[in-house]
Amino acid sequence: MQLILISGAIKSSSRNVIIKNCEISNTAQTAIYILGGRYNVVGNCNIHDVNNAIIVNAGDAKSLYTGGNIIRNNRISKFARLDKTYTYAVSLYGMGHTVEHNKIYDSEHAAIYFQGVENEIKNNDISNVCKETEDAGAIYAGRKWTSRDNKITGNYIHDISSNIETPSPVGAIFLDDHFADVQIDGNIFANINGTAIRGNAGREHNIANNIFVNCVQSAWITSYPTPSVEKYATQIADAQNFIYKNTEEVSRGKYQEKYFDELYKYDEDGTTVIVNTDELIYGKGLIYKNNLTVNGKDNPEYKFGDLCEVTIEGNKYANNASTYFVNPASKDYTIKLSAIQSAIPGFTAIDFSAMKID
């Protein structure tokens, strides 16, 4: 499908539809848009020279109604052709979607955007994105502290740099503005000309069992200073009072039942359930554990550390890449597990060969 003026394939409230072995290019807006559908699959497609490549807006986090859509084994490149920022290879909204074994590359801004509940991004090869931007990540999420149980696992994210000189460089994963509860494990980050994993005032992120090679910085985990709290919560127009809007979105139903202990409490009279926003703007419950950094900064940098509660343990910092990988000079990061485990006893195996189109 080529030279489509508005959008490519739009599937509204569809179920069990498979879009497979297609080439889609030269769309003015979105190549594939799944709106409200369940258990659909986009697989083995070549999508290039488009604006948005794939948008999935399905399932419902508030009622814990899963979408179950799968984006698998696609080659996606040269997206964001018209709008150079905030148009992605894959955008996820809702609940229960999977993005796996895709090769995503060659674009000016981020590759994947997500929010919601129980989404999984795994075994993808992402490179050469965020080439003409700043303050961004190859995988980006932000301003949804009600997002829960999302996973970024087993991805190879590499060769990320921007042509723009800025004090706020690009990186691999950026969890911005109070985004919460992401498991980041088993990933390999290589040649990141900025911070590989950046978190701004998030909670319950578990960053464990990852490998960082030739990254300017492994992780930067912060809490905002007090003056920024009011600014981000109420004053910035594009933030749209996101802290309070998020509160309104989840103050009911199955979501409240599942996450009561984490996010709710009773008011002073002990009878009314309210969202527990106590110190919401500070980073808490963060874990940085059993990660291997090779040829990078000796330690992650934690800004505003007095406001940021993070557990740091079991990490290893080294300079001899050949000790830990089969052929790092040729970008073969197949791990030597015994060597890594001798340095990090709790480290579990990472399959570099799985981080690609299957």
Stretches with model-predicted labels:
Residues 13:
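Extracellular repeat turn/loop positions enriched in glycine and acidic/polar residues, especially those
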Residues 179-180, 270:
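Active-site clefts of carbohydrate-active enzymes
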Residues 222-358:
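Acidic, glycine- and Ser/Thr-rich low-complexity intrinsically disordered tracts
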